[in-house]
Structure formats: structure tokens, C-alpha cells
């Protein structure tokens, strides 16, 4: 690793404004082309069981937002892809790397079902079995757009891209309900934004910044440092449409939010790298997505541009932890 590399996270960065060239932020185009499709904003809700389910996936696809369906109801995936295709919507699913997942890819091909997007979703994505899965998908479903992760180094990005991945997901344990850094001593928690920058410099294909985003301004910062798309969990948790279990405490409504490697997800205490928290229920997800878009439009206006490209060129300063601690919410 480069010892001269700048280490920072979202709360350590402030971008420096340029002259505004739009009359209104409504003129700003926040759309992003990711693979074969274009989406309203460079944001995707995390593919976690407390964040996304089939009705929400349909709603997101109908409204031109990117989504990735989680992989924790494997028996539903074939029908889900078929249903989305019948609706004329994009089909975007997740797979793991166990033997039956390789069989599932072959079954999709046998049924002549090609999802638009397939995300290989494991905690430590820099692994031979992930490379094997990328090549397996590309052999049986050559037209699927393959997202592979998660990784945290340029070497991993290059190797997964060379294996055939169309995009890589960067982030090892920076999420709000991920405790990888505490359980293992490894990860990008505390320097996730620097890791995104480090990986993006090596990437030839799109990067998804996954985890550690606590505020809408962090989306703009992710774009500045090379991400094409941002995966977000905690900001989407606790909405009326998200599928986490509701809990009433002293008359207040909360929703469960837990990590994909938590014991609540796994149903076992073995190899746990996630935890469960309760978040206040906070209204409709459409309102949050609209607010994200408006804040991103404002960010682009501060960058002196009309679209997301302008964010990639702005100057910035590192102000170590002087704004606030990103976990205060």
C-alpha cells in the first residue's frame, strides 16, 4: 500500500464551490447511465432483507431507480426474473457463491431467462470463487451485466474486472450495521471514501461505493472520488415500504434493520459480522429519494455544472472530523 496515500472518510471532506451556472437547481440533470440502462439518480438501496423486497423492487423499477433484489429467498428468484420481464421492467438479482448458486445460473440459462443485472454478493469479494462465478455467469448468461463485490483494494478491482465483471462494489464493513472491522480487524470502515478513490483510480469500469453514507451530501462526495453509483442501507431503512419488522416501543413505531451477515439474517451465531438496530419509521421512500435528488441537484449547482460530471472535477479540503461524527444519527 502507498504510505503517502491520503486517508479520509466522508465526514472529513468538504468540497469547494464554483460559480453557479444554472438559474435553478431544477435544471440540473442527476441521471446516470449504469450498464445498459439510465437511472434518475446514482443511488441504489442496499440489497438487504430489511431494505428491499419484491413490491419495492417493482416500484423502484417503475420509477426509473436502480435496485438489486437480495439473495435470501433463493427459491423466489427464477419467478421474480420472469415476473419482472413480463412487466417490461429491469430484472436485477443477487447471487452467492455456493455450489447451488452455480446451478441456479445454469437453470436461468436453460429457461432462457437473462437478468439485466446480476450482483455477486459476498462480504469478501476478492476470492477465487467470485472469479469463478463471474466467468460462470459470463459463459451461461453473456448478456447479463455482472456486479462483483465486495472489495477494498485496486488489486481486487483489477482482478475482478479482468475476470469479466462489468462493475465492482467497494466497501468492506463501513455500513452502520456491519461489524466486520470490530470482529476481524479488517475493512474500509473509517476510510471508506479514500478506499473508493483508491479503487476508482485503478478501475476501467464503474464502481459502486457501498456503505458508510450517512447523509445526502455523501452521495456527491462519492461521485467526486470516482463512484458511478452509491449503495445505501441506513438512509433507506425504516420507511413505510421497506420490509423490516415493525416494533412499537412506548407508543413510538420503529423498524428492525440488520446486516446481511448478522445472526438475525443467518439464523446462526457462526461467523457473524452484522448487528441489529431499531430505527424510527420515517414515511415514504419516494420522499427520501426525491430529497436525495434535490440535494444532489444543489450539489451540482455548487460544483458549477449542469450534471454529475461537474462533481468529479471540484476541489476539496480535508477537515479531519471537524464537521461531525458520521455515526451521530
UniProtKB/Swiss-Prot annotation:
Keyword line: NADP, Oxidoreductase
SUPFAM superfamilies: Inosine monophosphate dehydrogenase (IMPDH)
Active-site residues, as the UniProt record annotates them: 178
Pfam families documented for this protein: IMPDH (PF00478)
GO cellular component annotations of the record: cytosol; GMP reductase complex
Broad class of enzyme this protein falls into: oxidoreductase
EC number of this enzyme: 1.7.1.7
Coiled-coil segments: none
GO molecular function: GMP reductase activity
Biological function: Catalyzes the irreversible NADPH-dependent deamination of GMP to IMP. It functions in the conversion of nucleobase, nucleoside and nucleotide derivatives of G to A nucleotides, and in maintaining the intracellular balance of A and G nucleotides.
Family under the similarity heading: Belongs to the IMPDH/GMPR family. GuaC type 2 subfamily.
PANTHER family linked: GMP REDUCTASE
Protein name: GMP reductase
Organism: Lacticaseibacillus paracasei (strain ATCC 334 / BCRC 17002 / CCUG 31169 / CIP 107868 / KCTC 3260 / NRRL B-441) (Lactobacillus paracasei)
Gene: guaC
